[in-house]
């Protein structure tokens, strides 16, 4: 980040750039050119693709001028990351790209809970927001990670209860932020939880 003269940062409709704010606490970014990038929160693949192309359109002139661009991202760029799709679009256009690993959100959540994500010989399953068949997912062996569960917290908690997993599952919302909330169990939850809520579900046989 400090080596690149230009920083690309996702921006919400309200103007917030959370990933940039976090990065500013870890690196000296004074004097950088900041490119705010807006992305539609849509399940329509065509709408999302248009957003990634628009972001690449904003970044490409900087690269053409010989200026390296770093795009900040929440979590790790290889895991359900908007930044990766922008990178992929730029790569298709012939630009050199590089991925820098970050701390995956679910790894940070596991650390906040003091839990391991894996056990010997058992798999780890990672599910994005709105996974189509949560009941089938919860029946799988091993630990389950349910990412960005805040919008469907009621449905998630109900599914965990049906499988007898609510007491042993845990959740962290806004992990690492001043607004962080830790829930050691998935019972008695408030009606509204931050979108950035990750649930850790232990192996169903435990």
What are the residue ranges of the model-derived segments?
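A contiguous loop/helix-start segment that scaffolds small-molecule binding in enzyme catalytic cores
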Residues: 64, 138-206
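Short beta->alpha connector loops
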Residues: 13-14, 130-132, 150-152
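Conserved beta-strand scaffold positions in the cores of enzyme catalytic domains, especially
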Residues: 34-36, 97, 126, 169-171
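Class I S-adenosyl-L-methionine
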Residues: 2-96, 183-184, 188-189, 197-198, ...
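Short gly/pro/ser/thr-enriched loop/turn and capping motifs at secondary-structure boundaries
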Residues: 14-16, 42, 104-107, 153, ...
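Generic beta-sheet signal
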Residues: 9-10, 37, 100, 120, ...
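Class I SAM-dependent methyltransferase SAM-binding "motif I" and its flanking Rossmann-like core
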Residues: 75-140, 190, 204-206
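Short, structured patches in soluble enzyme cores that scaffold and shape functional sites
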Residues: 38, 73, 128-130, 148-149, ...
């Amino acid at each position: 980040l400090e080596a690149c003269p230009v920083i690309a940062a996702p921006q919400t409709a309200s103007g917030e750039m959370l990933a940039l704010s976090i990065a500013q606490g870890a690196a000296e970014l004074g004097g950088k050119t900041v490119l705010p990038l807006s992305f539609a929160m849509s399940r329509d693949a065509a709408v999302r693709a248009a957003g990634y192309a628009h972001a690449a359109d904003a970044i490409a002139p900087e690269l053409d001028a010989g200026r390296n661009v770093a795009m900040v991202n929440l979590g790790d760029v290889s895991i359900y990351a908007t930044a990766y799709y922008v990178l992929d679009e730029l790569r298709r256009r012939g630009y050199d790209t590089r991925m820098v690993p970050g701390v995956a959100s679910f790894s940070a959540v596991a650390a906040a809970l003091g839990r391991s994500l894996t056990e010997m010989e058992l798999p780890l399953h990672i599910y994005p927001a709105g996974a189509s068949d949560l009941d089938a997912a919860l029946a799988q062996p091993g630990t389950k990670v349910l990412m960005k569960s805040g919008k469907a917290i009621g449905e998630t908690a109900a599914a965990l209860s049906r499988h007898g997993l609510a007491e042993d599952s845990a959740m962290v919302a806004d992990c690492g932020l001043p607004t962080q909330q830790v829930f050691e169990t998935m019972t008695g939850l408030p009606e509204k939880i931050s979108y950035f809520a990750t649930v850790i579900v232990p192996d169903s046989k435990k």
